[in-house]
């Protein structure tokens, strides 16, 4: 397979998809999805993959939520009915449903879906998954190393860095409205939560986890 991701978010991309937004009250990132689907169609892709992932293992050592945001996990359903890439553009739109409570669930479900959809052998899927896991681990290690270096530098200089506590899609410059740039232009380093060493080992036993979503802060 040759992987093609949609282009960088722009205001024009966002506006292009607005006509198919089914609810004006849905969040901005969800509205932006419609424009990204159009972008992939324009790029000439022959298939679009937008899985429905309901659960993923928590990254914190404490027992916290495993559920994904209702919009994140439900929006592939919305896109299938509002934009319908298969009917409108002739582009197959894959929206498999996954429940990844642990790594074993993920591996079994990926093997089953790839076999059913593309007739790909389970051993080949396992090898690809292992390579992806190694690549992700390498990335996370490099990110943590760089975060540690930044924190050490600001301590030595008597300054400080800013951690923008957010969800992964807030890394999109259009979604975060350029907030990281606002700090960095003033010489203040900006880190994402996963760049902070030890962030997944924070003791949450004294917190009340009153939410059902990942990436949302607990109440003190």
For each feature predicted by the language model, list its residue ranges.
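A charged, amphipathic alpha-helical module
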Residues: 98-197
């Amino acid at each position: 397979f040759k992987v093609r991701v949609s282009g960088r978010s722009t205001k024009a991309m966002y506006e292009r998809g607005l006509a198919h937004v089914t609810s004006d009250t849905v969040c901005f990132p969800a509205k932006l999805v419609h424009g990204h689907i159009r972008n992939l169609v324009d790029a000439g892709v022959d298939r679009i993959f937008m899985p429905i992932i309901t659960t993923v293992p928590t990254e914190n050592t404490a027992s916290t939520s495993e559920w994904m945001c209702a919009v994140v996990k439900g929006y592939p359903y919305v896109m299938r009915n509002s934009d319908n890439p298969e009917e409108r553009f002739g582009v197959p739109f894959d929206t498999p449903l996954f429940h990844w409570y642990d790594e074993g669930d993920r591996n079994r479900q990926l093997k089953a879906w790839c076999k059913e959809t593309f007739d790909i052998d389970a051993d080949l899927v396992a090898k690809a998954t292992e390579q992806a896991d190694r690549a992700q681990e390498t990335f996370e290690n490099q990110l943590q190393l760089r975060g540690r270096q930044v924190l050490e530098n600001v301590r030595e200089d008597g300054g400080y860095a800013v951690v923008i506590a957010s969800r992964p899609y807030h890394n999109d410059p259009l979604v975060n409205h350029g907030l990281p740039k606002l700090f960095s232009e003033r010489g203040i380093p900006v880190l994402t939560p996963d760049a902070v060493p030890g962030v997944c080992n924070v003791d949450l036993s004294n917190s009340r986890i009153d939410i059902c979503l990942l990436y949302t802060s607990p109440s003190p």
